[in-house]
Every structure is written in C-alpha cells, then in structure tokens.
Amino acid sequence: MALLPILEFPDPRLRTKAVPVDAAEVTSQAFQTLLDDMFHTMYEAPGIGLAASQVDVHKRFMVIDISDEKNLPQVFVNPEIVSKQGEQLYQEGCLSVPGIYADVSRADAITVRYLDRQGQPQELHADGLLAVCIQHEMDHLDGKLFVDYLSPLKREMVRKKLAKQRKHVA
C-alpha cells in the first residue's frame, strides 16, 4: 500500500469540485487499490476520514473509519445526503488543515445514499460523530473546508498559523 500525499490548506486544488465516479469503475482493481491506499494514508495520518479530493483525486468518494480499533472501514462513492435532522456543534479538525480545530455546526443526524466498495447502492442513517464525519468529508468533495465556516478573520489566522508551521518544518 502506498502512502498518498495529503493536500494542505490553502492549496487551491482543495477547492476543486469532484466529479461523480462511474459505477463500473468502483470494482476495478485500480479503484480498489486507490481505496486501500487512502485507508492506509488515513490510518497513518492518523485520521477518521479522508476524501479523494484531499489526495488530489477529484472524484466523489471518501473513506471513513470512526472506530477506536480502526476495524470498521467504510467507503462512500457518490454520496448524497437525502435528509438532515437537528443540529450539533462539534469541534472539528482536518488532515488538510493540520493542528487546527474549531467548532462547526452540522446536522445531528443524516440519511445518506451512496455506492459501497462493491458498487452496490446503500442508504445509511447516521448520527453523532459518523454524521459529522460524513458531512465534513462531503464538503471536501464540493471544494469546501471546515475553515470556511469560520469568520474571515479566524480563517486568515489559520492560514498564517499553517504558513508559520510549514516554515518551521522546512
């Protein structure tokens, strides 16, 4: 398995809107290998979700595993939220915005339709952390980041903090 490079804010490629995946592509060996590489990258980061857009693949799919043991991998291809209920404030972080956390308001429960890893249509009702994670990763597929929910001033502070972090690493 390959470790894929994760794009970091403010990389403009993170703003690219992803295109749908052809259903026939889902079961191809190349797509399955990419999914394995994405899970490997997510687990190593470590994270609980990774959208294809974050690894510079601008197609509508993402991988998620919110389990503590990292043994419940979920694949969402062409996800679509069909209903939302309630609202919750949740502190979010992001592999593309390392070291930054902020409160974001999201639907508390959602119903999402998608294709699974085998290309089969599924519908899932999710709440709590899973609902937040799905919404967060779907934002990536639309070229949106959790920092977009922040005020312009806070967003600029995040950009400067990340630039400073990168300078110290270089």
UniProtKB/Swiss-Prot annotation:
This is Peptide deformylase 2. Disulfide bonds: none annotated. GO terms for molecular function: metal ion binding; peptide deformylase activity. Binds 1 Fe(2+) ion. Pfam families: Pep_deformylase. Fe cation binds at C94, H136, H140. The active site is at E137. Removes the formyl group from the N-terminal Met of newly synthesized proteins. Requires at least a dipeptide for an efficient rate of reaction. N-terminal L-methionine is a prerequisite for activity but the enzyme has broad specificity at other positions. Its cofactor is Fe(2+). Keywords: Hydrolase, Iron, Metal-binding, Protein biosynthesis. It comes from Xanthomonas axonopodis pv. citri (strain 306). Belongs to the polypeptide deformylase family. It is an enzyme of class 3 (hydrolase). GO terms for biological process: co-translational protein modification; translation. It catalyses: N-terminal N-formyl-L-methionyl-[peptide] + H2O = N-terminal L-methionyl-[peptide] + formate. Its EC number is 3.5.1.88. Gene3D superfamilies: Peptide deformylase (3.90.45.10). It comes from the Bacteria.
